[in-house]
């Protein structure tokens, strides 16, 4: 069973979410503030972190940033509808996805499972080169100028999707469906924030923005 670290300061929401996830087959450890969440993470890294944006003391964005500095574990942010700016900051800090409160319990469990599937899915295919960038799908390794890059599972899946469709413009909606697994309407900010982070690692020129259409990776030369 997958282990979830739930960091949420509201006792009612924390307990309701814990019960929901456990009923759906997850093993859940909880924390009520940012530092307690980091301590719990260090005691035994979970399979996925469910992290509230607004926390007392150290906020969720700071917690996300600290976890991401040492781990590629999937992170999903919990946010109120009024926390749009904080959600963007969380995505920029390395979160893989977010869920808006209030949420339907089945939707939350489905989103966590989708993120976990993306994180564990093994790709097939031959090595690909794009200038100084090399992608090894079988080993799930990406290197730039011979140096292996540290990518989160979502960043890796996004790069691989672009690479496997090199030269083709993929819309944000296509990327949401193929990378995030959304068959319903999703927030295209997820795509934009992850492209921005990915460019910071693979090079600003590696991924081209096609205005009004989407993104593409140039065909290997």
Locate predicted features.
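N-terminal/domain-start alpha-helical segments
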Residues: 1-120
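Short, Lys/Arg-enriched segments at the junction into DNA-binding effector domains
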Residues: 2-3, 113-169, 173, 220
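Short glycine-rich hinge loops at helix-strand junctions in the catalytic core
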Residues: 25, 166, 203
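Protein kinase-like catalytic domain
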Residues: 68, 116, 163, 199-202
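Residues within helix-turn-helix
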Residues: 106, 173, 189
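DNA-binding patch around the recognition helix
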Residues: 122-125, 150, 193-195, 199-221
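Conserved N-terminal glycine/acidic-rich loop preference
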Residues: 157-161, 185-193, 215-220
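DNA-recognition alpha helix
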Residues: 175-182
